[in-house]
Amino acid sequence: MKVSDRRKFEKANFDEFESALNNKNDLVHCPSITLFESIPTEVRSFYEDEKSGLIKVVKFRTGAMDRKRSFEKIVVSVMVGKNVQKFLTFVEDEPDFQGGPIPSKYLIPKKINLMVYTLFQVHTLKFNRKDYDTLSLFYLNRGYYNELSFRVLERCHEIASARPNDSSTMRTFTDFVSGAPIVRSLQKSTIRRYGYNLAPHMFLLLHVDELSIFSAYQASLPGEKKVDTERLKRDLCPRKPIEIKYFSQICNDMMNKKDRLGDVLATAQRIRRRYNKNGSSEPRLKTLDGLTSERWIQWLGLESDYHCSFSSTRNAEDVVAGEAASSDHDQKISRVTRKRPREPKSTNDILVAGQKLFGSSFEFRDLHQLRLCHEIYMADTPSVAVQAPPGYGKTELFHLPLIALASKGDVKYVSFLFVPYTVLLANCMIRLGRCGCLNVAPVRNFIEEGCDGVTDLYVGIYDDLASTNFTDRIAAWENIVECTFRTNNVKLGYLIVDEFHNFETEVYRQSQFGGITNLDFDAFEKAIFLSGTAPEAVADAALQRIGLTGLAKKSMDINELKRSEDLSRGLSSYPTRMFNLIKEKSEVPLGHVHKIWKKVESQPEEALKLLLALFEIEPESKAIVVASTTNEVEELACSWRKYFRVVWIHGKLGAAEKVSRTKEFVTDGSMRVLIGTKLVTEGIDIKQLMMVIMLDNRLNIIELIQGVGRLRDGGLCYLLSRKNSWAARNRKGELPPIKEGCITEQVREFYGLESKKGKKGQHVGCCGSRTDLSADTVELIERMDRLAEKQATASMSIVALPSSFQESNSSDRCRKYCSSDEDSNTCIHGSANASTNATTNSSTNATTTASTNVRTSATTTASINVRTSATTTESTNSSTNATTTASTNVRTSATTTASINVRTSATTTESTNSNTSATTTESTDSNTSATTTESTDSSTNATTTASINVRTSATTTESTNSNTNATTTESTNSSTNATTTEGTNSNTSATTTASTNSSTNATTTESTNASAKEDANKDGNAEDNRFHPVTDINKESYKRKGSQMVLLERKKLKAQFPNTSENMNVLQFLGFRSDEIKHLFLYGIDVYFCPEGVFTQYGLCKGCQKMFELCVCWAGQKVSYRRMAWEALAVERMLRNDEEYKEYLEDIEPYHGDPVGYLKFFSVKRGEIYSQIQRNYAWYLAITRRRETISVLDSTRGKQGSQVFRMSGRQIKELYYKVWSNLRESKTEVLQYFLNWDEKKCREEWEAKDDTVFVEALEKVGVFQRLRSMTSAGLQGPQYVKLQFSRHHRQLRSRYELSLGMHLRDQLALGVTPSKVPHWTAFLSMLIGLFYNKTFRQKLEYLLEQISEVWLLPHWVDLANVEVLAADNTRVPC
C-alpha cells in the first residue's frame, strides 16, 4: 500500500484493533508491496502512535536462527480501516536466515575472488573486512537471493501473461530469453535457470552501497546521480508492464556479462530517472523502526549485547515525541564488538601439561619432540604437518598443547581432532580422555547440538569433517558463540587431522572427502596434520586435495622456528610447514620389530600355530591379525573362538558397533586376538600387544608400515603368503603391493632414505637380523623357536583349515546354514555323504576308502586314513572331535591289537572297541560288551583265519559292526570274491597284514564306512567333508557336545513355532481366526519397526541373531524367528501407550539381541495377550470386519463439543477441500502441518512427480528428524516412517486412487468444476501427521465415542476406509 493512499483509511480504533488482534481467525496474512514478505513473523506487542494515528506493531521473526537479531528492523506499521479485515504490513528488507546458517565473518577468500571474477572479469580487487562480511551473506544465504530472483521473474511473467496482446510487453525479454517472446519462453524451467544466474547480480545491486570496492564508482558520480539502493530495491519490484520493460534492461545488462557493474548501475540510474518522469516516484515511509526495536530489546534484557545512541531511560512517550525532532530516526542498532583477550603462553605450560598427564617424572622422548610441542603451542605458524615414525608419540605432540590451552582461565579453547576410521576414533577417545585433563566428546555431539561450553576436544572421523553440517557450524561460529554464551571468549583452537596421508592414498574414499574443501580453515587458530607415512610428495598432494595451498616449497628444518612474515592471507592460503622427523633422525623406522616373511601352505593354519605358541609363552599378551577380506575376517573369528577370546571388526559393521568392539578389546584384558581388515592397523595403541600377523597378499608399503607400527615396544610381525600365489598386482590409483625381498630396504625407498643394499646395516629387524632388537624381543623369538622345535619333535602338528579356505566365501560355508526369510539362506542340517569313512573323513571324492594294509616287519597297524607313508599309517580315526570308530581286531604273531584314535608315532593301539562320546562307532564283535570287542577263534595253529560274524561259506564275511547311534554303521568285512580273507583277525606268521578298509579284487575287506552325522566335523556342519577335525593343543580330543544341544534346541523351536507357510504370522500363533487376522494383520511392520539395537545386530545369523555355529534355524523354514519377534513386539505395542511401551522396551533389554529368547518370553503370556487384544480391539474389529457404520449423532460429546459434528456431509467435504486448497496454494508441508499445525513451506513436495522425490523433499527439510524427536516415532527405527511412503499400504493406495477417479467422474457428470483433492502421498502424509498428533488424537477419541485408542500406524491408516454418517445421514470418510 502506498503512503499516498493513506487518506483512504480512517484513524484506527485502538479497541477494535485489540479485539481483532486477539481473534486469530480474523488475522489474514497480506503480503507487503516489497519482495521481502517471506519472513515469518508473529505479533508480540503493539502501541498507538497518537501523533501519526498509526498503530505500531512489534513483530518477532520466528524463522531467525539468531534470536538476538530477531528484533532488528522488524517493527512494522499497521493501519486498520473501520471495515477493513486485512492488516497491511510493511516488512523491512532484512534477509531471511531460515534457509541457511548465520553469516560468518571469515569467508574463504578464494570463493569471493571467484565470485568477483565471474561478475567483473577482473582478478585484482581489494577487500576489507567489511566487504568480506557483506559478500559472505550471499554464499551463506544464496537460497534467499535465488528465491528473490525467481519471484522477480515470476512477477514479470504473470503481468506479461495477463496482457498477451501487448506487443511491447512481449518484447521486453526478447534479448534476455534467446529472442523468444516472454509468454512462450519464460516458463517455470527458464525462470529457475535464469534466476540462478541472476542471483549474484541481484545481490550486488542490493548491497552496492555497502561495498568499499565500488566506492570509487560512487564517488565519480555527481551528487544527484548517486545510487539510491532503497529506490533500487523498490524498482526491482515491477508491478506494471512499463516497469517490466525497465527491469528487463537491467537483467539484460547483467546476464550478458558484457558490462562491468558500473555500467549496470548506470543503466539502473537511467531507468530510475525514466521511472520518476512517469510520475511513479514515492517518498520513503518514515517509521519508528529503530527506536521501537531498541525498546523491545531493553524489555527482553538484551541491551548488554547492543549499544544505541540514545538513552535507555526514556519512556514510550519520550520515544514517540522525539521521533519528529530527531533527524537521525533511521539509526541502526549495531553489535558490540569486543576483541577477544588472549592469555599469554609460556614454554612452562607444556611441561606442566606433561606432568599432569604422566606424573612428576615426565620427560620428553628427545629434543625433537620438545621443539615440536613448542612449535605447535607457541609459534604463529598457521599450518603444520609432521611426519614421525609409528610409535614415536605423535599424539603427545598435540595432546600436551591441548592440555595447556585448557588450563587458560580467561579463554575457552575448543579444538577438533579427526581420524580416518571409527576404530581409531574409539582408541583416541580412551587415550585423550585419561587422567581427566581434557573433556573429550564425539564430534557428532557438536554437529547435532552445537558447542556445549564444557568440551575441550571433539573427536570425529573424516566423514564428519566433510559433512555440510560441520562446515556450516564452523562458518557460523562467531554468531553462535555470542548468542549462546554472550561472550567472545570461547575460541576455536586447533584443527588436528591424524593420518592425513589417507586423503591422497585412499582412492576409493576420495569422493567422500570433497566436502572438506568447503571448510573455513581460517576460523581455527592452527591446523595440525600428522602421519607416520606421508613423505613430502604424498603430504603435498593430500593437503591440496582438501583445498589448502600445500607444503612450503622451501624445505624447513625442525630447528628453523622462524615466525611467519604475513598471516593476513589466512590459514587456507598459507603454505604448510613440514617437519620430517624420519629424515632428520636418518633412522629407518620399525627397526625395533622382528619382521618375518613366510610362505606357507595354509595361512590360517600357520597363523593359528603362531598364536597358540605365543599364548603358551605369554598368556597375558595380545595379537592382531590382518585379513584381506571381510569374509575372511568372519571365518577366522568363527574358527578360532574355541581356542581364545576373539574380537573381529571390518568395514561393514556400524559405527557404534566398531567403537564398542574396539573399546572392548583395548580395555578388556581377557581379549586375546583382534581380527580385522587394514582399518585395525592405523593409529590404534594397544598395551600387551606382542604379535601382528598379516594375511593380505596385496599389502602396500603404507599398510605394512602402519601394521608393524602397532608394536610400540617391540614384538613379532609375520607376513604370511601362500606358496606360488604371491601376485604383486597394482590396484588402480593406489600404491603397488610390496615386493618379495628385504622389507627394510623397501621402507628406506619409501621414505627417501639412503639405500644400504649390499652394505653393512642393510637389514634392520628383518631377514634374520636381531642386532637392533630389544632384549625382550630377542628372548621372545628364542622361546618361540624352542617351542616350535619341541612341537616338531613330538609330532604335534595342528590340523587346521585347508588352503582352499582362502578362496572360500563365508556366505558359502557358514551363512548358508542360517535360515532367514529375508535373505533366503536355507538351513541345511543333514548327514554327511552317504558313504564316508568310519569317522575320519579322509580326502576322497564321494566315498572314503581306508588305507590298504601296510606290511611291516613284525607288527601291523590297521589304518583307515589314506595319506600313510611306506611303513606306518595312522589308526582308525586320527584326532577326531566328536566321533571315533574303533579299528578291527588285528592278529599279529599270536597277539591281536585294535587301534582306536591313535595319535602316536608308530604302532600304539588301544582296546578294540572304545565307545567314545555320543557318536562313537563300535567295531569288530557285536557279541561283546558296549565298549570292548575281542578277536574270535584265535586258537588255531599257525595259519588260522578267524572270521567274525561268518554267515557265508568260506568266501564271504559279513558286516562286523551293527548300527550304532542311529547314524553310524561300520562294515568291517563285506563280501568279496572267491578268496576273501577276514580282514579283522588275519593270521600271519612273522609278518602280518591286517586289512581294515581296503577295496580290491581277490583279497579285500570292506572299509568301515560310516554314515557320519554332522557332529563328525569340527563345526557341527558336514559340508562335503572338506574340513579335517582339529585336535586340541594338549593332545586331548576336543569333545564337542554343543552341536547336540543346538540340534535339540532346533527341534524344540520347530515344534513350538511351526511355520511352513510364508503367510505365517504371530497373530496365527496367538490363535486368532483368519478373518480376524485379515484386519489385525501387521502390514507395514518390518525390522525398521524395531528401535535401534533391537533385533538388528550385524554379523550374526539374520534368521535367529545367533552365531552361525549356534544357529537354530531349520531347513525349509519360511518365516524367520526374527520376523516373528518383531511382529510379537508390534503386538505388545498394540496394548501399550507411549509411556508404557517405552518402559516395556527397557524391561526386555536382555532380549534386544536375542529374538529367540524373546519369543519364548512372549509365548509364556500367549493366552493373556490374546484376551487383551480381543477385549481392547473389539470395537476395531466390529468396524473394520463387520463394517459397522459410525453415526456422529450417536456421539453426545461430539455434538456438544464440535461444530463439525453438526455439519452436513456436503459442508464437511467443502471444508476438507478448502483446507487442501489453502495448503496447495501456500505450498505448505503437509506432514508437519497436520503434526502440530506448523505452516512450513516445502515447494518441492507439491512439485514432486513420484514417491522418491517426495520423500527426498521431506527429508531435505528435516521432517522425519523432527517427527522422531517430537513424537513416539522415536520409539521405532529411523527409517520406519520414511518407508511408509514406499512399499507399504499398497491396498489402501489402490482404493484411494480408485476413489479419486470416481470423484472426478461424479463431478464431471454434474457439470461442476472438480474439486482438487490431494494425491496419495499428500493424503498419507496427512494420516501419518494426525497419527502422531497427540493432541488431535486425544480430542478425537473424546468426541467420537465409538472409537478408542490405536497404537499402531497400520491400524490408524486402515480406519481411513471407514465411513461416517454425517448429521444429514450422508456418508463421508472417517
Swiss-Prot record:
Matching InterPro entries: DEAD/DEAH_box_helicase_dom (IPR011545), Helicase_ATP-bd (IPR014001), Helicase_C-like (IPR001650), P-loop_NTPase (IPR027417), Sir1_ORC-binding (IPR021646), Y'_ATP-dependent_helicase (IPR050978)
EC number assigned by the record: 5.6.2.-
Compositional bias per record (Basic and acidic residues), positions renumbered to this chain: 1012-1035
Annotated positions binding ATP: 388-395
Domain of life: Eukaryota
Gene Ontology CC annotations of this record: cytoplasm
Biased composition (Low complexity): 832-1011
Domain Helicase ATP-binding, residue spans: 375-552
Enzyme's top EC category: isomerase
Domain Helicase C-terminal: 609-758
Residue span of region Disordered: 321-345, 832-1035
SMART domains: DEXDc, HELICc
Induction section of the entry: Induced in absence of telomerase TLC1.
Gene3D superfamilies referenced in this protein's UniProt entry, alphabetically: P-loop containing nucleotide triphosphate hydrolases (3.40.50.300)
Function in brief: Catalyzes DNA unwinding and is involved in telomerase-independent telomere maintenance.
Name used for this protein in its record: Y' element ATP-dependent helicase YLL067C
Organism placement in taxonomy: Eukaryota, Fungi, Dikarya, Ascomycota, Saccharomycotina
